[in-house]
Amino acid sequence: MKIDILTLFPEMFSPLEHSIVGKAREKGLLDIQYHNFRENAEKARHVDDEPYGGGQGMLLRAQPIFDSFDAIEKKNPRVILLDPAGKQFDQAYAEDLAQEEELIFICGHYEGYDERIKTLVTDEISLGDYVLTGGELAAMTMIDATVRLIPEVIGKESSHQDDSFSSGLLEYPQYTRPYDYRGMVVPDVLMSGHHEKIRQWRLYESLKKTYERRPDLLEHYQLTVEEEKMLAEIKENKE
């Protein structure tokens, strides 16, 4: 996968040199290039200006973004604008982006964008219902969530299939050694070696956590007969 990032602050992306994303780059599975669009600004390197019609704040000018975009070697990229008014990013969106060969992220700053910049864009995406100073942190979050889904980046596909949201449910509790730590012990079922009972316990705990913390996820989740029975028991125990 090739990712190009248009930003005023390339140095903010140093975390992408480490961990899973960094390893993907080392393996040659990922190429990330940064483009400081201030370098393409014509008016004394000014990238922003006052909005027509008045109003508070400054807008990113179209010219530096367009010229930086035109300079990128590309074929058929997915172009993502980080915008609080965009569609909310989620695991399904990450899975969709992971299928692409080319991504371009446009990271804004200031009050907003000249609307004409959006003619370059295929996707306007937001992390959530809050406003960040710029798009850089949002872009890094989306890149991390997307890159880890690329085949061969993590290794076993099952490593991320059990993650929260990948299955549609929140992830079940997990434990490692020692068995007893400060009086907190590992559930006996996980020590039993009985694979079917362990599967049932994990499914029950996933449903329980999802029902308690993110019941909205269950509105779009297709329950199996087994899951319906478990969820009914969970609700009954909560009453």
Swiss-Prot record:
Stretches assigned to coiled coil: none
Ligand binding (S-adenosyl-L-methionine): G108, L127, G128, D129, Y130, V131, L132
Chief location category: cytoplasm
Keyword terms: Cytoplasm, Methyltransferase, S-adenosyl-L-methionine, Transferase, tRNA processing
Reported function: Specifically methylates guanosine-37 in various tRNAs.
E.C. no: 2.1.1.228
Subcellular location: Cytoplasm
Class in the EC hierarchy, top level: transferase
Gene Ontology annotations of biological process type: tRNA N1-guanine methylation
Record InterPro entries: Alpha/beta_knot_MTases, tRNA_m1G_MeTrfase_C_sf, tRNA_m1G_MeTrfase_TrmD, tRNA_m1G_MTases_N, tRNA_MeTrfase_TRMD/TRM10
Name by which UniProt lists this protein: tRNA (guanine-N(1)-)-methyltransferase
NCBIfam families: PRK00026.1, trmD
